[in-house]
């Protein structure tokens, strides 16, 4: 463990009145880091063989388990359709962060350094950096587009960041529909984890229901 100086991007997004040009730069850096360091195709034979099973565990089995006591039957079916769609679109990569939202990215404006914090370190039953190419994008979507950290803090979303996220997805020719579906799914499945605040859970449910 080490002490790192800087400001969480979630705090900058929610509480600082920064020029749009600063956000353009920050989002460019985040996208470029993701594409440069968390995008290598997996070449390990054993991981390639077991990938379908692992991705099913991450996207489908986990979703079914967490959604069991939430939403109406019709809503759960719609959310699970998101899970099946995303799981079918995934491909294995060598390195995945696994929890890539703005509260896990530290930015030091003096040194212009970005630090990605608290990586998952597991994909299904597989320990390590192995993962899929959609999960980190979906995590960013559940925050930048659907406002995860704004919902947690109960403050207004940053609309410019939301629009900019879509703009950057288009610029990099990334699968917007799949990423947004994955982001909404991850927002839905994190609701049980926020058992300490029923009002927060309700805000998350409303966001999911309004976007199904």
Question: Where are the model-predicted features located?
Answer:
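A structural motif corresponding to the C-terminal end of an alpha-helix
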Residues: 40, 164-175
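Conserved kinase catalytic-core helix
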Residues: 9-58, 67-90, 171, 184-187
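All-alpha amphipathic helical-bundle segments outside canonical DNA-binding/catalytic cores
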Residues: 174-183
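Amphipathic, Lys/Arg-enriched alpha-helical patches that create a basic surface
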Residues: 209-212
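Active-site activation/catalytic loop segments of kinase-like enzymes and analogous catalytic loops
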Residues: 122-169, 184-200
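Active-site acidic catalytic loop and adjacent metal/ATP-binding pocket
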Residues: 82-131
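A glycine-centered beta->alpha junction motif in the catalytic cores
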Residues: 2-23, 60-67, 121-122, 146, ...
């Amino acid at each position: 463990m080490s002490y790192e100086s800087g400001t969480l991007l979630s705090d900058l997004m929610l509480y600082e009145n920064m020029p749009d040009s600063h956000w353009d730069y920050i989002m460019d850096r985040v996208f470029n880091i993701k594409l440069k360091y968390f995008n290598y195709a997996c070449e390990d034979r054993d991981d390639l063989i077991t990938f379908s099973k692992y991705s099913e565990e991450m996207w489908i089995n986990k979703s079914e388990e967490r959604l069991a006591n939430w939403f109406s039957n019709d809503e759960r079916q719609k959310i699970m359709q998101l899970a099946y769609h995303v799981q079918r679109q995934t491909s294995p990569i060598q390195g995945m962060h696994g929890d890539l939202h703005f509260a896990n990215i530290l930015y030091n404006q003096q040194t212009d350094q970005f630090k990605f914090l608290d990586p998952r370190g597991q994909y299904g039953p597989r320990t390590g950096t192995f993962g899929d190419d959609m999960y980190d994008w979906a995590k960013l979507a559940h925050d930048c587009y659907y406002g995860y950290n704004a919902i947690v803090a109960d403050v207004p979303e940053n609309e410019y960041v939301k629009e900019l996220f879509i703009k950057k997805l288009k610029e990099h020719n990334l699968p917007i529909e799949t990423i947004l579906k994955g982001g909404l799914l991850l927002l839905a499945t994190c609701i049980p984890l926020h058992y300490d605040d029923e009002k927060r859970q309700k805000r998350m449910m409303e966001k999911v229901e309004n976007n199904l």
